[in-house]
């Protein structure tokens, strides 16, 4: 299902952002410019330990949002306090690369984030020290692909943006140029 046109954000990155970043950090080589590698969307369904049907709703939601079938995350070991057995499905995740990644990022930044109630921006402190950024969304209905009448329950998700940046300053600059609405510290 490859699109014939280049995604809007990818074009903007290639034509404008890459040049700005190269000037800003004065790179000697074009390949040193930070870029996006992949986006991982993770949906943990802890209640699936008690009711295995709940994982189907998470898979359906993730497929609708990302356009890609998610991989089911299984428990690595048994934990009696959580009534969890090894190998039991406890979540689902999708790894997006290429054009699908750019399209998803564009939809998230321009459509989903503005639909969050009382949204004041993303925290600028959630970088991992290597230029990758992770943020959480509390409900899946902020994506317009999800029909609000058909959801069985509200589920949150974690979205990790993996970049080629070597430190947080480069990663923050890349994501700010791409249009991430960071809160001012």
UniProtKB/Swiss-Prot annotation:
Q: Which Gene3D superfamilies match?
A: 3.30.1440.10
**What is this protein's gene name?**
rplE
- List keywords of the entry alphabetically: Ribonucleoprotein, Ribosomal protein, RNA-binding, rRNA-binding, tRNA-binding
* GO terms under cellular component: ribonucleoprotein complex; ribosome
Protein's UniProt keywords contain tRNA-binding = yes
PROSITE patterns recorded: RIBOSOMAL_L5
- What protein does this entry describe? Large ribosomal subunit protein uL5
- Domain of life (superkingdom): Bacteria
According to its UniProt record, which protein family does this protein belong to?
Answer: Belongs to the universal ribosomal protein uL5 family.
Q: Which organism is it from?
A: Streptomyces avermitilis (strain ATCC 31267 / DSM 46492 / JCM 5070 / NBRC 14893 / NCIMB 12804 / NRRL 8165 / MA-4680)
Role description: This is one of the proteins that bind and probably mediate the attachment of the 5S RNA into the large ribosomal subunit, where it forms part of the central protuberance. In the 70S ribosome it contacts protein S13 of the 30S subunit (bridge B1b), connecting the 2 subunits; this bridge is implicated in subunit movement. Contacts the P site tRNA; the 5S rRNA and some of its associated proteins might help stabilize positioning of ribosome-bound tRNAs.
Q: Which PANTHER family match?
A: 60S RIBOSOMAL PROTEIN L11-RELATED (PTHR11994)
- A Gene Ontology biological process term: translation
Q: What's a Pfam family in this record?
A: Ribosomal_L5_C
Q: Spell out where the chain crosses the membrane.
A: none
- The residues the entry assigns to the signal sequence are none
Q: How does it assemble?
A: Part of the 50S ribosomal subunit; part of the 5S rRNA/L5/L18/L25 subcomplex. Contacts the 5S rRNA and the P site tRNA. Forms a bridge to the 30S subunit in the 70S ribosome.
User: In the record, what terms sit under GO molecular function?
Assistant: rRNA binding; structural constituent of ribosome; tRNA binding
